[in-house]
A protein has these predicted regions:
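Charged, amphipathic alpha-helical segments
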Residues: 1-2, 43, 47, 93-94
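A short, Trp-centered hydrophobic/proline-enriched beta-strand micro-motif
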Residues: 6-20, 59-61
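Acidic-histidine catalytic/liganding microenvironments
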Residues: 11, 56, 92
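A short mixed-secondary-structure module that forms the rim of ligand-binding clefts
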Residues: 32-67
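Charged, gly/pro-rich active-site loop segments
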Residues: 71-130
């Protein structure tokens, strides 16, 4: 899991795919954090992303760096504890001008049954599950 987190942070931007009914939706994201041994991402409850995850928690992330790409798929599970939201915002203090762990909007999810695949054109794919 740490290798996945490191890759996402080094890539800077990754792309999160969700489903909106039968229409795929993809958008850039940047938050990734390990808390209590789980990989978390963050969004706001007022965003369409939140509603799409609630309707279908199966998502996929894609990131690219230095000729290698990462595809991470799994189910997102909301963690509604203040401690989880605070940990994420402490890791990304620049988000505190938009979010607060007690604002009723900040939302964090962790990956469950995740499969991460690192691929490139020059090596065999590496698969990590968590």
């Amino acid at each position: 899991m740490q290798k996945v987190l490191d890759f996402l942070k080094e890539a800077g931007t990754y792309y999160l795919a969700t489903m909106d009914g039968d229409q795929p939706r993809v958008r850039p994201f940047g938050t990734a954090h390990i808390f209590e041994g789980k990989l978390y991402i963050q969004t706001g409850k007022v965003k369409p992303t939140s509603k799409q995850i609630a309707a279908n928690p199966k998502v996929e992330i894609c990131a690219f760096k230095d000729g290698t790409w990462l595809r991470l798929c799994g189910k997102l599970v909301e963690d509604d504890r203040v401690e989880a939201r605070k940990s994420m915002l402490d890791a990304y203090p620049e988000l505190r001008n938009m979010y607060d762990e007690n604002d009723g909007n900040t939302q964090v999810f962790y990956f469950k049954n995740a499969t991460a695949t690192f691929s490139s054109f020059t090596s065999t794919p590496e698969i990590i599950t968590f």
